[in-house]
Amino acid sequence: MSKKRVLTGVTTTGIPHLGNYVGAIRPAVRAAQNLDTESFLFLADYHGIIKCHEPEMIHQSTQAVAATWLACGLDPERTTFYRQSDTPEVMELNWILTCITAKGLMNRAHAYKAAVQANAENGQEDPDFGVEMGLFSYPILMTADILMFNANEVPVGRDQIQHVEMARDIAGRFNHRFRELFTLPEVKIDENVELLVGLDGRKMSKSYGNTIPLWENDKKTQKSVNKIITNMKEPGEPKQPDESPLFEIYKAFSTPSETVEFTKMLADGLAWGEAKKLLAAKINAELAEPRERYNELTADPSQIEEILQAGAAKARKEARELLDKVRDAVGIRPLK
């Protein structure tokens, strides 16, 4: 029985925070340990430059994201871990797929439609004002990322479902027009994946400014946790889990029995200040070893580069084999 292929891409436009760890990194690392799964994880730096035009940010984020995944337990021996820009076969496939993709399909992409709508609301006569081709056609690049390794499943958030559906559409069009070479990928949505709340109770997000950094030291983590909003109840007054986002964050770092005990402590009047100390201790305990590893990797980025180059060599070997078949299918062949 062949293994199921799962492919995940991570953009390189920021430094991962605690919400990324709980919602994406931790579950993905655990899933990659499944013996029935063949995992591919890539740093989507070409996707990153679609919106981010700051070279140093792209460069620094690539290092930080790679170090984060490795520090959090990603095993490059079990997962093909590579940088998108190190696999030129993906970009060649991107062009071939661009040549068979209907413009109307791209017109329906959510990101493009949102840009057009924003222009209309702002009174712009040109609906495409400010729209660059990277934004317009990036679903095709995402399709190339997926099809290059014939992934069976692509874990995505609900806002990304459309892109996997587009990948299926484009793969089907190629298979029908030329040759059956591509697997039709399936969306994978894990309903049990936690969406961590931030300091203010909304989803933890850089755009909200409510994040808890992942790689700060113990004291700074405590300072961040101290900013979690709470009500004015005094020590000794009973408190309910839904009265502060603190409880949901605590739950993400605790066993079910520990969560039950914490609920009881709140009901018995645990002071918010003490509750925050308990939470910070939980976070710091789980991240102690990953933080040490992260600091080692970022102090010597050549370690990261070596791992990425090894992953790229592995990825390219496989990509080349499929791309040769694709080129042959569309008529790009040696002259004999």
UniProtKB/Swiss-Prot annotation:
ATP binds at residues 11-13, 19-20, 157-159, 196, 203-207. Keywords: Aminoacyl-tRNA synthetase, ATP-binding, Cytoplasm, Ligase, Nucleotide-binding, Protein biosynthesis. GO terms for molecular function: ATP binding; tryptophan-tRNA ligase activity. The keyword Cytoplasm applies. L-tryptophan binds at residue 145. It comes from the Bacteria. One of its GO terms (biological process) is tryptophanyl-tRNA aminoacylation. GO terms for cellular component: cytosol. Disulfide bonds: none annotated. It is found in: Cytoplasm. Its EC number is 6.1.1.2. A motif ('KMSKS' region) lies at residues 203-207. It holds the Pfam family tRNA-synt_1b. SUPFAM superfamilies: Nucleotidylyl transferase. Its main location: cytoplasm. InterPro entries: aa-tRNA-synth_Ic, Rossmann-like_a/b/a_fold, Trp-tRNA-ligase, Trp-tRNA-ligase_bac-type, Trp-tRNA_synthetase. Catalyzes the attachment of tryptophan to tRNA(Trp). Belongs to the class-I aminoacyl-tRNA synthetase family. NCBIfam families: trpS (TIGR00233). Homodimer. PANTHER family: TRYPTOPHAN--TRNA LIGASE, MITOCHONDRIAL (PTHR43766:SF1). This is Tryptophan--tRNA ligase. It comes from Neisseria meningitidis serogroup B (strain ATCC BAA-335 / MC58). The gene is trpS.
